[in-house]
Amino acid sequence: MIENENTSLLSTSSSSTSSSPNNANSPSSLNIGISNSENGTPRKDNTSGNNSPSAQITKYNGIDISNNSSRNSSRPNSRSGYRGDSSSNNNNNNNNNNNNNNNNNNINKHNSIVYNKSNNKLNSIGGSNNDLQGGGGGNGNGNGNGSSKYKIGINNKDVEEKIEIKKQKKMNRTNNQKFWRIVGSILQIIGLSSIVFTIFIGLYIDGYIDWSYWILFIPVYVILAASYLATGSRVLSNLVSWIIRLVWRLSVFGLTVFVVFTIIHFKYNTFGFSVMMIPLLFTFGSVFVMGIFSLLFGIIFVDGKSTPQRKTKYIVNGLPLLFTGAILTPAAIMIALKLDGLYDAKLAVCFVSLFIGDIIASCFSFFLLIFSLGSKDTATFSIGQLLSIIFITICSIVFKVLLILATDQQHNINSLFLLIPLLVAEAFMVFCGINLFLRPPRVIVDNSEELAKSNMINNQDSSESESDDETEVSFKDREDEESEKLISNL
């Protein structure tokens, strides 16, 4: 009879374990009692011992789960309760499995929490931080929201860059108009002062006035003063490259010294024409050298892929400087040598380079005029500005021809008649200045994208440096708070 009881107990325990195969690998499977018999009495397991087959798992990853498992793992001490059928054992095992699954879910919740330092938010892998859903159920939504936020961030950055580019273009357009208005004002001052000075020279040569040279050159002083004031203009400094500014300052300084040397030469006759022309040679030579430097620097040293506007700016500024210096420097040298008698050549030979310059300038202006007639609305320069340049070059050619006839051919030409082409050219200069002031050209160096990107980079760097400390503090505080909430919930 005792043997039958023992065999029935063993069969009951084995059937209970085999009926739940999913519980074989779970910790709850260790709670199933194993019975042995000594002298016909079943032996009870000591659940407090570690060596017992039914030892309970009390901690998992530092989380106490002993309350849930120990509550349902207690067995009845009576023999009849211990002998319960397989259904009661299965119920106990299912309860243990449910408790362990709950503990595993809590562990997954704890492991699924991720702190996103860049956004200063506590996000879970399974979805929002309010639900704290673990596992892969909410993974798709989380990744979708992250990618959408990333796309929104990129779109916002593109919009900010476009807005910054529009601001820079508007600022460049405004500065461009101010620049050309200042240039127009300077041309008006130079033209009016030149007209007055030309009239004074004609009257002085014909003997109508007998003034001192220091008084006679007062209009020239006005021109130099306006040129000096233009060097301090912020608008001119921002839109014109440093090479043009340097050449302008050197030219103003050289012309000032040349005027002083001219007055000293004609009034006191202390030195010859060669010494008087030294400031002009210095000015024209510096223009020529800086033109070569700007052209070579833009071609060789400036990267056209990263900064194409900068490369174009150096090349465009270098070409007219090179052209002007190459025309004026040999003419100044030959004129100085002829006036001192060191070079026996006609004045027509000395003016060859000047004629070449006038012809090139006239052709360039004429072709611009032809192109502008077909597209008046989109043309860079207006028709009046181009016509003014053409008439100025024509008057310059006529004046040089009359001067050659008066000196080389020994023709008796009245001084006022000789100076008429100069007066007409100076009048067109005034007209061109007025036109530039009223209708500024559409010549804009479009570097708005580079300026916008540089401004955005500077703004981002400053904002990141300011908010770095606040980000660290807020992240640590949020991490501590969420950890405390999680531990209290568990």
Curated annotation (Swiss-Prot):
Where do Low complexity bias regions lie? 1-31, 66-80, 89-108
Q: Where is this region: Disordered?
A: 1-151, 455-490
The annotated regions of Acidic residues compositional bias extend over 463-472
UniProt superkingdom? Eukaryota
Where do Gly residues bias regions lie? 133-145
> From start to end residue, where is composition biased (Polar residues)?
47-59, 109-125
Q: Which family does it belong to?
A: Belongs to the TMEM185 family.
- Specify the protein name: Transmembrane protein 185-like
Q: Which organism is it from?
A: Dictyostelium discoideum (Social amoeba)
